[in-house]
Amino acid sequence: GLTVEDELKMLRVIRRIKETAPITVKANFLGAHAVGRAYRGRQSEYVDLVCNEMLPKVAEEGLADFVDVFCDAGFFTVGETARILEKAAEFGIKPKIHANELEVSGGVQVGVKYNALSVDHLEKTTDNEIEALRGSSTMPTMLPGCSFFLGLPYGRAKDYIKAGLPVALASDYN
């Protein structure tokens, strides 16, 4: 993945599955989950590629229900994430965010700002993230399988619940 051709190929396969499977299937565009090898050291050029080539082609073919951006240390910054989400919104592609797996990144707040369906991971969380989600429609999603497999701390699910927030659990299995 992480090239225009590879991302489109994967999403076209998902489209075929959606058309033939007897269950509901949703497609996530994951081109903003890491920077492609050819763009190492040229992060802003890769963000340009996502915004100016990948997302327009994904939208033109109607291939994705969601765009999922990994807003965390070593991946995409809050500013880059916002830029990608703004471009996706132009095409009606709804956002999801992976954030706070490695450090408190600001990804929760950018997810809330852009009305993301969910913010996923949340292994590293402060009270600021919990407060940001209160009153929003963005779903905090814990991925305990990822924590277990990578030896990371588990998210503060109880604190989210005590704050009156719903919490979703997911596998992060891909």
Segments predicted by a language model, with ranges:
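Active-site-adjacent C-terminal substructures of enzyme catalytic domains
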Residues: 94-95, 103-174
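Metal-coordinating catalytic core of metallo-dependent amide/deamination hydrolases
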Residues: 1-106
